[in-house]
Amino acid sequence: MTRQSPSRADASRPPRADASRPVPPRFVRPGAGVVKVGTWHVGTPARQRAAVEAIARAWRRRARPGGGPLSYHVHTSNDGTRLLHYSQWTGEDAYRDFVRTARDGRNAEIDAAVPGIERQGLRSYELYRSRRTDGDGREPGCVVVVEIDFDGPDPERRRAWVDAVFAAIGSDPQAHPGGISAHFHLATDGPRVLNYAEWESERAHREALEAPGDGVGSATEQWERVRNHRGLTGSRVTRWTPALSLGAGVLDRRV
């Protein structure tokens, strides 16, 4: 069950003034039962750009599959080597129908344009909690994906950790102003939490990491509870730039 923050994270997002740029995901979306997140390794910035263009062509020239996705967002890694895919579906059955009837043709066209793509690590998630300040109209220049692993799949432990993060954010006396939003997802197929965090820029996120304390967040008791939460085994941080968004009945939007 998705928990919305008191700010109703997506209801406050104003219409975009610049339709040439990708639309951020609508995280709290009616009917979205599962989120798929995966990466492709492409190797170079030039191949990143070519792959994004190939994805846009492959999807634009075909009818949208009846079962979805509800939305599909592609990001380029800031190190120039990978793509991140974030898609929303009504459920696993809708995704399986897409794989059975529509995925291979699209992938074949993309692979013909950019040979040698390595498709890695597609996982299923459910959105648990989102946070965005009411009326904050800033657009993300950088998406920070934080993957947090636990020593077991217990969903209650993972929810408790996310709740602790929200308490720490809400009480932080020196939160970096460059953070825009945070959207926490629980893996349905393993012991992981994924935070899709929107920031003004990569520089803003780096400044937050370099501030006093251990990572993003001040040296408070609440953040200490987050960092020492029972069952944590490790985490990984990657930075991405929004590149392409596709949705039902919506023209693609590209950088």
Where do the language-model regions lie?
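Short S/T/G/P-rich N-terminal loop/turn motif that feeds into the first structured element of a domain
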Residues: 1-83, 90-255
